[in-house]
Amino acid sequence: MEQQNKRGLKRKALLGGVLGLGGLAMAGCEVAPPGGVLGDFLRMGWPDGITPEAVAMGNFWSWVWVAAWIIGIIMWGLFLTAIFAWGAKRAEKRGEGEFPKQLQYNVPLELVLTIVPIIIVMVLFFFTVQTQDKVTALDKNPEVTVDVTAYQWNWKFGYSEIDGSLAPGGQDYQGSDPERQAAAEASKKDPSGDNPIHGNSKSDVSYLEFNRIETLGTTDEIPVMVLPVNTPIEFNLASADVAHSFWVPEFLFKRDAYAHPEANKSQRVFQIEEITEEGAFVGRCAEMCGTYHAMMNFELRVVDRDSFAEYISFRDSNPDATNAQALEHIGQAPYATSTSPFVSDRTATRDGENTQSNA
């Protein structure tokens, strides 16, 4: 009888390990998680992703919760079984001793209970790295490269490279502004300044990118970054002052923006395979950066490829035109629709009205 009980315990432990590993194996699958109410529950508040990278992260997140619930149910089941089946009162009713049967020195069981958790962690780590590599890979062959500059407390977006299929004249577009870029490079050194570090200038902006087509956010206007749907895109990030973080919730991903990113050995670039939905999506700074950090928003406006090509052509041909005029030209709302500017004037917010319309 004792030998049978031992075999039963081994089988239960093995079953628990198999179920746990099975759940974790699902975590690395590209299979979409359940939909409906169950799917919403498993997402635990995560928004629906609009890039393949976001979908991969969302799938991984949901299936990890499936694995966690499977393992949790098994462990709580064993825990409650031990409480109610082997409790002192139950043992007393059965006429057994005060202490339940002891299982120490059961080497096979101890090995199972040691090895299975290690394998679970290893499997989870494997699929974590697999998903992370997909998200951070720089192999997307981008057709649009956007320079993103964060500063207290707004954003500047510029187009540095655009594939010929989306650019004016059908030729690859190089958007760097040579004159301003040269001026930025010249700001690097200031031998006559009071900075003691090898004559480096305090106002060095040589690491920032300056483009002919740019969208600059202001206190009164949320910057709208226009991008094409179904197109690989690269983002090149930097900060003009303190640490910021570029975050679009539907990307399920954020990347910090630092001053002098190369000198700080931080990765300033990330790529997405495509954006799968058109529409307006709010973007935010996800790094505490000072007084108005919470109001440092922008909007991602995703349009079809033809509209994006027309948008770029209009801005290239009309350098003095505003971003709002270019958006109107392609039939889009001229100002942000997903978020509003914050009125920073204290005297204007006494009644609690702290947003204003661009209209």
UniProtKB/Swiss-Prot annotation:
Q: Tell me the keywords, alphabetical order.
A: Cell membrane, Copper, Electron transport, Lipoprotein, Membrane, Metal-binding, Respiratory chain, Signal, Translocase, Transmembrane, Transmembrane helix, Transport
Q: Does the keyword Transmembrane apply?
A: yes
Swiss-Prot/TrEMBL cofactor(s):
binuclear copper center (CuA)
- How the cofactor binds, per note? Binds a binuclear copper A center per subunit.
Basic and acidic residues bias spans: 177-192
**GO biological process terms, semicolon-separated:** ATP synthesis coupled electron transport
In this chain, the site described as Not N-palmitoylated is at 29
* Residues involved in Cu cation A2 binding: 285, 287, 289, 293
Q: Tell me which EC number(s) this protein carries.
A: 7.1.1.9
The protein's matches in InterPro entries, at most eight in alphabetical order, are given as: CcO_II, CcO_II-like_C, Copper_CuA, Cupredoxin, Cyt_c_oxidase_su2_TM_dom, Cyt_c_oxidase_su2_TM_sf
**Any idea where this protein resides?**
Cell membrane
**Segment Disordered: which positions?**
168-203, 335-359
A GO cellular component term found in this entry reads:
plasma membrane
**Parts of the chain that traverse the membrane:** 64-84, 107-127
Annotated membrane topology: Multi-pass membrane protein
Gene Ontology terms for molecular function: copper ion binding; cytochrome-c oxidase activity
Q: List the disulfide bonds.
A: none
Q: How does it assemble?
A: Associates with subunits I, III and IV to form cytochrome c oxidase. The 4 subunit cytochrome c oxidase forms a supercomplex with the menaquinol-cytochrome c reductase complex (cytochrome bc1).
Provide the family line: Belongs to the cytochrome c oxidase subunit 2 family.
Its biological purpose is as follows:
Subunits I and II form the functional core of the enzyme complex. Electrons originating in cytochrome c are transferred via heme a and Cu(A) to the binuclear center formed by heme a3 and Cu(B).
Query: What protein name does the entry list?
Result: Cytochrome c oxidase subunit 2
Annotated gene: ctaC
